[in-house]
């Protein structure tokens, strides 16, 4: 059984027991979260597709950790002008373990 849900403006395809990195959520580590914006649920050969969300669909997850991703380097460069600007960014994330899927 798997489901597609949305969180943080992104869509994630998950199965039970899977660990997923989401955009940062303001939730304590060890807490349980319910995601109600389920777009699709599939079990074997049967599919439930929402318009836009599956009625009664829910993905339950437990927060495992919070952290920061790999550094992305941004370089702005003007040719022939001896001008260079460099910056970096590390995006915050929340790691969750999927504990239940229901439709």
Curated annotation (Swiss-Prot):
**Is Transmembrane set as a keyword in this record?**
no
InterPro entries linked: bL21-like, bL21-like_sf, Ribosomal_bL21, Ribosomal_bL21_CS
Its cellular-component GO annotations read: cytoplasm; ribonucleoprotein complex; ribosome
Q: Which GO terms describe its biological process?
A: translation
Does the keyword Ribosomal protein feature in the UniProt annotation?
A: yes
Lineage, top-rank taxon, reads Bacteria
**MF terms per GO, please?**
rRNA binding; structural constituent of ribosome
Its keywords, alphabetically, are: Ribonucleoprotein, Ribosomal protein, RNA-binding, rRNA-binding
Q: What does this protein do?
A: This protein binds to 23S rRNA in the presence of protein L20.
Cite the NCBIfam families for this sequence. Answer: L21 (TIGR00061)
Give the matching PANTHER family.
50S RIBOSOMAL PROTEIN L21 (PTHR21349), LARGE RIBOSOMAL SUBUNIT PROTEIN BL21M (PTHR21349:SF0)
Q: Which family, according to UniProt?
A: Belongs to the bacterial ribosomal protein bL21 family.
How does the record describe its quaternary structure? Answer: Part of the 50S ribosomal subunit. Contacts protein L20.
Output this protein's name. Answer: Large ribosomal subunit protein bL21
């Amino acid at each position: 059984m798997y489901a597609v849900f949305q969180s943080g403006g992104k869509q994630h395809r998950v199965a039970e027991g899977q660990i997923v990195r989401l955009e940062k959520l303001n939730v304590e580590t060890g807490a349980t979260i319910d995601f109600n914006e389920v777009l699709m649920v599939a079990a074997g050969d049967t599919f439930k597709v929402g318009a836009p969300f599956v009625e009664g669909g829910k993905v339950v997850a437990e927060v495992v950790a919070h952290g920061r991703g790999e550094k992305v380097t941004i370089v702005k460069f003007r040719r022939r002008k001896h001008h260079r600007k460099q910056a970096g960014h590390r995006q915050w994330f929340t790691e969750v373990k999927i504990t239940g899927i229901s439709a």
